[in-house]
Amino acid sequence: MSRYLTQLDDELCWFPDPSHALEEPNGLLAIGGDLSPARLLAAYHKGIFPWNEPHQPTLWWSPDPRGVIRPDQLHVGRTLQKIIRRTPFDISVNRAFNEVITACAAPRRTADGTWISQPMIEAYQQLHLLGHAHSIEIWQEGELQAGLYGLSIGRLFCGESMFSRIDNGAKIAMVALCRHFARHRGALIDCQMQNPFLATLGIEEWPRARFLAELARLGHQPLLASCWQEGEISL
């Protein structure tokens, strides 16, 4: 299979097959195009996602292997279980999407900048208004302390980013997502790439072909209707 980088046309909402993605950098498939809801949804339904530095044009990726978590097999170690039991917090769904994505876009202490630009924020806010993008929020004493956001495609959730202002807040948010998603027939969480944080939670690396086959299968299967209704949830 030939591998090449495709320049996208702003007028055409189209992507090449992910099998053409470059091996180095791993998964880079296309460049350019807008961040319209139609293009973003077309990308995610083909296992493609945008990621680029703010000074770069939009870059589209489909890495091989793909990092995934099966929500019913999430690894919650003893230490994290104790933290969850002993830490007072409230959890909600879709109560503060804009605040979550804004917090995810804020510069981190461990990084020089952020990849979530203002156009990216506005694009996912639009997807949220259309019912495709969702958030999980962790609260303490009425203050938003951690959260994550992503897209739901049938029984698959495409995680995008997370943040935390408290110790282990991001892990608690991931546990909340997995348990809530599994209770509503969710079957797979796309984490895009392996990293040390996700390794502690049981991330698996699947060949891209396996991930795309599962995406095609799960993307047309419905969740329980109440999954993304705004409100509080419990672990």
Give a label for each model feature.
Residues 1-235:
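N-acyltransferase acceptor-side catalytic subdomain
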